[in-house]
Amino acid sequence: MSERSRGRRFPLTLDAVVERKPAERQREKRISSGVNAVSLPTPARTASAERASSTPAPGPGPQRVAGVDAAVGAVAASAVQARTQAAHAAAGGMASDRARQALVARVQAAGVTDARVLAAIGRVPRHLFVDAGLASQAYEDAALPIGHQQTISKPSVVGRMIELLLRERPEPSAQAAQVPAQPLSRVLEIGTGCGYQAAVLSQVAGEVYSIERIRPLHEKAKANLRPLRVPNIRLHYGDGMLGLPKAAPFDAIIVAAAGLEVPQALLDQLAIGGRLIAPVATDRAGGPSQQLVLIERRGRFQFHSTALEGVFFVPLKSGTV
């Protein structure tokens, strides 16, 4: 690694991002004894300017370099495959390639078609993000409790939401389906939970910032992600409804809890040309109590909203606990 690479501010190893405590070191040691540390592949960094202001004016999203992310990601994926297989062999059948590919097939059957998203789900060892007593269900397409009245989302819902962020709008004259966009540069996740969705996002985005308001879950996500050595995730403890203005603007925002509306602070932090996906509560009689809403920022004061399918998420709350 060159001296220039060492001096880069991002990406950093997770150890450089979060505080390491003695108890967590012991937990990491116990995890490593059963599952070797796995380095997940990440897309190459794309060029973006430093944000000096804590409340920057919205502008175009970070620049993307076509082709670079795909090429580097393919090499990294090849290198990590051997490490993943070795780690999963030590962990037992529940973490085998067969189990992970069976999950990918279930997610695909549920309607997720983007090859990048399916590959990302297939690389992330979901059993590391659930309690040991639920590990046998980790590769089912099901939401599972993670404590504190929160859940790890269904993989098909995770895939669906990320897929929507990756898709481009079709041109008015286009006859075909939507065309996939270039990999995301900077993503904000509201609601880290156990860290699973952030891990999947890290496979399709250059930088992932994730906020959790529940301190024990924030600590759990740090512990879950540390053995995977994911270099492009930054975890934050705080009020997700306020977003993360110091790191804005984001070319994608994904919200993992349902509010009555999308907080204005999050809309303000979305780059022009960016997309936000969130579950929103509805009051329609006879309809779903929540539905996914896709918001596209088309100008400084111009937003376009599209209501999608019904979903069920935990409620979006303010403050920290």
Curated annotation (Swiss-Prot):
Gene coding for it: pcm
Subcellular location: Cytoplasm
Family, per entry: Belongs to the methyltransferase superfamily. L-isoaspartyl/D-aspartyl protein methyltransferase family.
Superkingdom field: Bacteria
EC number: 2.1.1.77
A biological process from GO: protein repair
Biased composition (Low complexity): 41-56
UniProt-recorded name of the protein: Protein-L-isoaspartate O-methyltransferase
Pfam families with a match to the protein in the record: PCMT
Keyword Transcription regulation: no
GO cellular component, one term: cytoplasm
Region ranges (Disordered): 21-65
Basic and acidic residues bias: start-end ranges: 21-31
Keywords noted in UniProt: Cytoplasm, Methyltransferase, S-adenosyl-L-methionine, Transferase
Keyword Cytoplasm in annotation: yes
Main subcellular location of this protein, as a coarse class: cytoplasm
